[in-house]
Amino acid sequence: MFAKLQRIHFVGIGGIGMSGIAEVLLNLGYKVSGSDLKPSAVTERLESLGAKVFEGHRASNVEGAEVVVTSSAIDSRNPEVAEAHANHIPVIQRAEMLAELMRLKYGIAIAGMHGKTTTTSMVAAVLAGGELDPTVIVGGRVDAMGSNARLGKSHYLVAEADESDRSFLKLWFIHAVVTNIDREHMDTYHDMEDVERTFVEFMDRVPFYGMVVACNDNEPLRAILPRVRRRIVTYGTTEGSDFLIRCVPCDSEQLLLGFLNRFSVEYRGKSLGEFLLRVPGLHNVRNATAAIAIGVGLDIPADKIRAALAEFRGVDRRFQLKGKANDISVIDDYGHHPTEIRATLAAAKQCGFRHIHVVFQPHRYTRTRDLMDEFASSFGDADSLYLLDIYPASEQPIEGVNTEALARRITEVSGRATFYAKSFQVAAIMAATAAEPGDMILTLGAGNVSQLGPQILERLSAKKVAAE
């Protein structure tokens, strides 16, 4: 590979996409350094593995580095990037480094606008259950790994493929999974036709001996499959899917054991039997079936696939229980797009809570502007809704695009009362006041809303004490 490199430097090493690659490189024996604006649990873990992590971005941080890796969030004005250019140190995107790791491996790339992280984690679990010991790089902390990356001993590498900046077109892989396409990342893509062309190009990167595993339930994806020039295997509840899903209600014993999904799968008319999941929602059944398709393609016995999925415990910030107080569950989820919000709320409804109280933090001004009407119709399964200010994610404000405008639009479209919470403290008070025993409070968004859970739990505990 690039064995002669002495030091690889990551600008923004604490990012979820960057840290996984850095961890694998550390485990391969490379010297790794990096910088981030502030320390975190992620940077502390990397330091424990041997990385040198600098707080803040300074030109001196790249001294001695032989390559500098950046994410799409880092621009050319960054002092470390500028210093690297001035000294002719190669500056590459994280996708180029991931591509180099995948180039000499049996790569499996997981793409799609929604569900990538969970599907990547499930595919990794299936390969591990089949004793294939994969290397894994994923965009979220996986409970079973205790991290977002692991170095396996086999030639298999499972990686999440980032379409947000088209960088997934740089990757090398044998098989690809595509979960869906949607109106997302429209700051990168001109329109849906551009999205479609790019995903067709991605799927055509599969070699002639590989396969594309595609969700047949996503109509926009299904519509472009005839344009793909590679072998395609489909999955879904749609009749005619190669891997056909039949959902079955869990029985009382399975529910007591913590299972939330039960389904059977037929592969081209042949039954693979029933499967159980501990994560809720039809979207997770689809994600699991993508992993089943990969497992079957790699000749992993169905019983080993079944056992691996039954033990799958989920991913950080994907319907993650933060705690319970006064018989009220506080759950956090990364969902920040209308499609994800609808799927998460449907999963919450499946769990049988009395009422669902949602605290939503919109993510990016451009996404809020472009999908305002879609957001307005996404909260139908919520019993109460509290909106925080838009999390900018480095974007500048856009005139007329704000939480108050979104709240008005939701009320116009759905007729539901929507409350603006001007701070985390106010949101915690509102949600905790509304919730009663048997309810759930769901925090939603891709920003820092996950930090709200402890405040809500504190309010709920205080409410219980006051009631006593």
UniProtKB/Swiss-Prot annotation:
Positions contributing to ATP binding: 112-118
Record's keyword terms, sorted: ATP-binding, Cell cycle, Cell division, Cell shape, Cell wall biogenesis/degradation, Cytoplasm, Ligase, Nucleotide-binding, Peptidoglycan synthesis
Compartment annotation: Cytoplasm
One GO molecular-function entry: UDP-N-acetylmuramate-L-alanine ligase activity
Predominant cellular place of this UniProt entry's protein: cytoplasm
Catalytic activity: UDP-N-acetyl-alpha-D-muramate + L-alanine + ATP = UDP-N-acetyl-alpha-D-muramoyl-L-alanine + ADP + phosphate + H(+)
Pathway where this protein functions: Cell wall biogenesis; peptidoglycan biosynthesis
EC numbers on record: 6.3.2.8
GO biological process, one term: regulation of cell shape
A Pfam family reported for this protein in Swiss-Prot or TrEMBL: Mur_ligase
Signal peptide: none
Cellular compartments per GO CC: cytoplasm
Function description: Cell wall formation.
UniProt similarity note: Belongs to the MurCDEF family.
Listed name of the protein: UDP-N-acetylmuramate--L-alanine ligase
Organism field: Koribacter versatilis (strain Ellin345)
Gene from which the chain derives: murC
